[in-house]
């Protein structure tokens, strides 16, 4: 693959007038290899070289009036775009900012900023429980371990270095006094690039926030092209932040504002353009995936399969519940955060033998930046188009109340129809791990998906809700056995019972049928 990329880049160079000597270096990074050296050589990764020349689809689009610049204009996009993106995504090391996470081991020191009072204090959790979740995130990555944890109080978590001078110095002394520490996980939503840089310089180790740790758990668990594309899109803010830091460092050395190869562009402008082109390609590819999803969704609608989306906090037992409801032995649930990153569909039957589609979704997590969730918006679109939602909760988890609030907050931001939210069934899973809770709400059911407790009641409630939400009715129809009526009903409805009346060659058929299908039946056979 590397030789192919090199040859393509070199061929392009033949038609380009270079004012600087270009030293080709085989790097996967978009910008980490870009260095202007004192000898005048400019080191550029091959993927970047390819973007400079007129053979790039980016420049072809600009030549022809920019009609390709709109992501929604899928009919004008050549398959070259998707092939290019898939080629770059074949290796998981998509960016230098996060590549080091997945290479080798890390001995992590978890630091949790504890806000004692004020609007920033978490009212639904405790510092100890939040540290426990942070540790679970660390253990989700291979060869990562937790060396120690520390809860450090802070009055101003939004300040530049999170902590006051005294606490920050204490923290610095602790980290430097333990050479076995190779990384610090600061348990906050997102650190600015400047804060991250200053902390790394002060402590001498890598510093991660929840965004980078969760993003790399996603990368480790991503197996499909769609998941990798979504993660590549979510990585772009990190790439841009690192670019600012690197450019600032080069400016101090007098190289950041130097024009490159006589192109009239500075280093920063080149990198910004490369990142923009990368973003365009990824979004184009995701639009293609989205179009395929819409096609599948349309086919389901034509066949009138009810769609039931299973959602909930990460590791709440969603996949285990789907396995229990469908009997699909091919499903292999894992006791792991973010084990599911792709939406998968699974056929099942309700007690009335009506076929339905259960949709397994990505798990939610508290304190995730909006743009990380937004990168998976195409995946979550299946939730919006559901006929019924089932919210699975790990009722045995000490933070189950906070987890519920986090899930409901995300659902609210998705802009779901209010009727879909009002009819959502809440499933309190893992009751085998605690004393049986007492439910007072009709829409709340207690189950153990692993051991099968409460599943029959759940199936009945799901059936009732689906019948109501999809406008299905139980109808008894008299059919002529010599006509195609019965075979039509088997195809277009859910046949419950057939009572043959041999004396007149007819049968009474009890079916579950939608209003639209019943209208078609009457039009065909009741003239």
Curated annotation (Swiss-Prot):
Its cofactor is Mg(2+). GO terms for cellular component: cytoplasm. It holds the Pfam family GTP-bdg_N. GO terms for molecular function: GTP binding; metal ion binding; ribosome binding. The keyword ATP-binding does not apply. Residues 306-470 form the Hflx-type G domain. GTP binds at residues 312-319, 338-342, 360-363, 429-432, 448-450. PROSITE patterns: G_HFLX. Signal peptide: none annotated. Keywords: GTP-binding, Magnesium, Metal-binding, Nucleotide-binding. It comes from the Eukaryota. Transmembrane segments: none annotated. Mg(2+) binds at residues 319, 340. Belongs to the TRAFAC class OBG-HflX-like GTPase superfamily. HflX GTPase family. This is Putative GTP-binding protein 6. The gene is gtpbp6.
